Amino acid sequence: MFKKCILILAASCMMYSCATQTESNPFLTEFQTPNGVPPFDKIKLEHYEPAFQKGIEEQNANIQAIIDNTEAPTFENVIVALDNSSPTLDRVGGVFFNLTEAETTDELTALSMKLAPTLAEHEDNISLNQELFKKVDAVYSQKDALGLTREQQRLLEKTHKKFIRSGANLPADKQARLREINKQLSTLGITFSNNILNENNDFKLYVGKEEDLAGLPQWFRESAMAEARATGQEGKWLFTLHNASRLPFLQYSANRPLREQMYKAYINRGNNNDKNDNKKIIADIVRLRLEKAQLLGFDCYSNFVLDNTMAKNSTAVMDFLNNLWSYALPKAKAEAAELQKLMDKEGKGEKLEAWDWWYYTEKLRKEKYNLEEEEIKPYFKLENVREGAFAVANKLYGITLTKLEGIPVYHPDVEVFEVKAADGSQVGIFYVDYFPRPGKSGGAWMSNYREQQGSIRPLVCNVCSFTKPVGDTPSLLTIDEVETLFHEFGHALHGLLTQCQYKGTSCLLYTSDAAD
């Protein structure tokens, strides 16, 4: 009787523990938030790993159910079931992998390194599962007789090809080697990216003399002074490798040695023979990618990647680039000669170098067209440009974007908009994250926190690296940055306006060279 009571008590404790974990870990159930947005205010570092583990267990069980199904394989009970097999992984992965790019920390990076081999193994366990592939192949073999819609045909084709490209047809010994390669590549890629991010963050060009700021616009000086003040360097100016700092510095700084220092620091990221050096990592990645491609029947990795794109092979790509090169190279040489003439007028006997290009291009624009980019920027206040992009979307598609307050975000810079169609129905939720910071990768991109699927509306984000407002000076965009905002918003519209029945055919799941 005593033992029975102990067992009952233990079982009760286990049930309570599981219930408590489910209640406290927001990833383990559908998000209980307006519009199902991620509850960033409740998500903690310790939630990710158990959620990934639970997601793996859940998908394994769902896949086993597909395999154990005694009915004849069909599009619904195999392809659709597989497409819907990972709700928890989709939830936690949608947040985790976005934040490792937009708001990472040392702890998040370490966790990413820890999880990468496990997730790579899980992916291989699915792709190399022979019983599952037999069912996928059985459906694929009768594709022409199934009366599928174009979208269903696309999902079936993508699913089957993914298994083939992942090694489902390889013999056991080659599959084992492929697993090891994928495991190594999963961590090498993270290390490479993290080293670049570290190099971006580690480089700090402090300027202590005002004469060394010659040529720099006043707004840029104020921004650099605010950056220095934030690091405890009062009375100095701080310039970094983030686009919003590096590019204006190269464009306006009259101090050639400092331009050279800035340019070389950027170009040599991962090439400084220090803890962030990427040379061996690059060599390992190239070697493993080549071996992987050859295992899968391709002569090189580029042909393996391009086989899944519109271009199809590296020959087509090189033909395109070589044709472009025949026109671009003479033009570039003519522009370089023009810039060199401008340098020669200064009588310093200097030869045009890469770190001179932006600076003398700006001077040439002034001399040739009486136009300076600084004269244009006041017309491109960030908020005005964004509203312009929203207005274009309204004119083209009838949608409206309204700012939402009180929605959880992962950083104070992030803003959230609700997107509605002309009839008032919801199109999706749109996040914007426009300014650089130490935990954020450089560049600009669009991504999803949730894919559109049937009646499920997408959660889409744009992440950029525009100049932050300083004091009373708003964020003013260059022409290139205006183009970037519209470009990334175009990708966001693709994600928001997607109307697909299946997750596997939704916005981000098209060929990479069709994207831009």
Question: What is the meaning of each model-derived region?
Answer:
Residues Y16-S17:
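C-terminal motif of bacterial Sec signal peptides marking the signal peptidase cleavage site
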Residues T22-L216:
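N-terminal helix-rich structural modules
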Residues Q21-H47, K54, Q261, E367, ...:
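C-terminal, non-catalytic "cap/extension" segments appended to globular domains
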Residues Q32-H47, F96-L115, V139-E180, T240-K280, ...:
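Short His/Asp/Glu-rich catalytic/ion-coordination signatures at enzyme active sites or charged loops
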Residues Y510-A515:
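Conserved small/polar residues in nucleotide/adenosyl-binding loops
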Residues C5-C13:
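Sec-dependent N-terminal signal peptides
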Residues L155, T187, N194, E199-T240, ...:
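Active-site-proximal, well-structured secondary-structure segments within enzyme catalytic domains
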Residues D480-G495:
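Active-site recognition of the HExxH zinc-binding catalytic motif
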